Amino acid sequence: MDRVQRLTGPTGLTVHEDQKMLQELAGTIRGIVLDVDGVLTDGKIIYGSDGSEHKHFHVQDGGSLKLLSAQGIAIAIITGRQSSVVQRRADELGITYVSQGADNKAEALDQLITQGFPNTNLCAIGDDVQDFKLFNHPAVTLMATVANAHPAVLAKAQFVTQRRGGDGVIVELSELILRAQGRWPYD
C-alpha cells in the first residue's frame, strides 16, 4: 500500500516491524465489527423539525463493505444508539449482523456470535471510549480507529485511518485487510 498505516502505542518496534505485524494481523481477519456514529458517519446527528433523524454515510464505504462481503469477510454493526436510518443502511448493504442500542458492545458481539458471526480473528473499528469493551473482546485481534477519534482510542488502536470518521474510512480498512490476504482485486 502506498498509504502509511501505523501501529500506535508503546510497541518498542521499528516502523518496519510494526508494518509487518499489522500486515500479519490484517491477514488473519475473518470479520469486521463496525461502530456507526463517528466511523460510518461523521458523528453528527441531524434531527428534522418533524422528529426525523438524518445521518450522512459515505458511498465509498458502502462499496468497500460490499467488496469485503464478496471476499468472504463477515460484517457486523454494533452501535450504542437505536436508529431506523442505521437499519436501512445495513439492509441496503446486505449486513445481517446488526445490534443497536448496545450499552455493552462486547456483550452485543457475544450475541452476534451466537447467531453465527465469526468468533475469532475479528477487526473492530470504533472512535470513542465506549468502544473499549469491544476492543478488549477475546475475538478481536485487530483494533482500528479513525483519524479524529478520542485520544485514548488513538493510543490503543493498532490501525488508524488517514481519513476522518464518515469520510470513507472503510475504504482504507478494506484495502489493508484484502491486500494482506492477497485478495485485493484492483492491482
Where are each of the predicted segments found?
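Mg2+-dependent phosphoryl-transfer enzymes with acidic/Ser/Thr/Gly-rich catalytic loops
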Residues: 54-58, 92-93, 97-99, 106-187
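Short coil/turn segments at beta-strand junctions that form active-site/ligand-binding loops
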Residues: 28-30, 73, 120-121, 141
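Short secondary-structure boundary segments
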Residues: 36, 80-81, 102, 147-149
